[in-house]
Amino acid sequence: MTEGKRMVDTYKVTHAIHVGDREILFAVDDGKTDCPYMVCDCNWDNPLGIDQFFDPAGSDDYLEMMTEFTNRVQAQLEAVKAERDKITVPLSPFTQEHCTPNNYGESIENKVVVIRTERLRHEYRTVNNQLVLAVGGFGTYANARGRAVYTVNLYSGKEARWNREDILGVLKPEYMPGWAKEQLKQILAGQQAKHKEQVQER
């Protein structure tokens, strides 16, 4: 990608809106008189986390492609709304008062930590996206030089990598929701079973 200019092949990106799990791009190449306007989707679902463009559509009609662009954005908004409607727990995010501060002199391994809301996309700034179990990574250690913190989301069970500075703090036990306690039990039980299998295979 050229400095100050985002490109998709020969097309210059003029509009980009990120909603949910992807970004919708509108790009222009005035040199292609037969198809100067292009719309595509972009995500980063790969080991290197680089731009991955897909589902392109092109035309010489600006209004047609702008309509395609806005339709895709609307479809993503509806998908995120539908996803949120399925959530069965209170959504109000945790703040600093719910946590012990992120003390770099202490280990956070195997502790339930809270992700800072500002590190989450606006549509995901809810408690179900904040609560995670820190399961490993150099960033979990006390006085660590590393930053990586590998986590398991208590609501979805999905694994993710964060940096230590993305963490607001360790959740105070008195604020642990009932649903999170149950999910934590299941996650820990699964980890113990997996560890037992690995030991038996040696």
Predicted regions and their residues:
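Short N-terminal "domain-start" leader segments
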Residues: 1-38
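Non-Sec secretion/translocation targeting segments of pathogen effectors
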Residues: 65, 189-202
